[in-house]
Amino acid sequence: MSKSFYGYIRDAWKNPDETYVRDLRWERLQVWRKEGSVTRVERPTRIDRARSLGYKAKQGIVVARVKVRRGSMRKSRYIRGRRTQHTGKNKITVGKSIQRISEERAARKYPNMEVLNSYWVGEDGKQKWYEVILVDPSHPVIKSDKNLNWICGKAHSGRVFRGKTSAGRKGRGMQTRGTGTEKTRPSVRSNLNRSKK
């Protein structure tokens, strides 16, 4: 059976350092570094990945490329006339993944849209880039799309801020079932509060 066009793109992105993606990325990152934190793009960089996550080239769907710093939290050293014994600064990390942070930043940039999903497109020593797929739930084209109109319901309002996207569910431990996950459902916080009642 012959491989499709998307199949060749998918194979190239599996090992981006060994294929033609390496040269493309070298050129793209020079342009992306000069852009802002959230930039709307005309079409997805990885069309195969975008389509597998629900992207369609139609009205009401937007793709935004988000630039986020790599590493820990970048906490600043405060000067308040004293020295605390346990100044948390260097090894403090955020409880969210960088991909989840990028989704939330895109959602704040476009408050009338909901985040459908996101995927990695590049990184260097300082930053990571993700492309976020956003959907307008009030657009008539989206409302009439049987594959996407579920996002128009009130239950999916602000879904990215409640950890309902794929990256959010992964960070909450929802991808795993069985032994060792007894305290993850419905959430770590609500499971902790069960003993206080």
From Swiss-Prot:
UniProt GO molecular function: RNA binding; structural constituent of ribosome
Keywords recorded for this protein, A-Z: Ribonucleoprotein, Ribosomal protein
A Gene Ontology cellular-component term: cytosolic large ribosomal subunit
Start-end of Basic residues biased regions: 163-172
One GO BP: cytoplasmic translation
Domain of life: Archaea
Region (Disordered) location: 163-197
Biased composition (Polar residues): 186-197
Family from the record: Belongs to the eukaryotic ribosomal protein eL15 family.
Protein name per the record: Large ribosomal subunit protein eL15
Organism placement in taxonomy: Archaea, Methanobacteriati, Methanobacteriota, Stenosarchaea group, Methanomicrobia
Gene coding for it: rpl15e
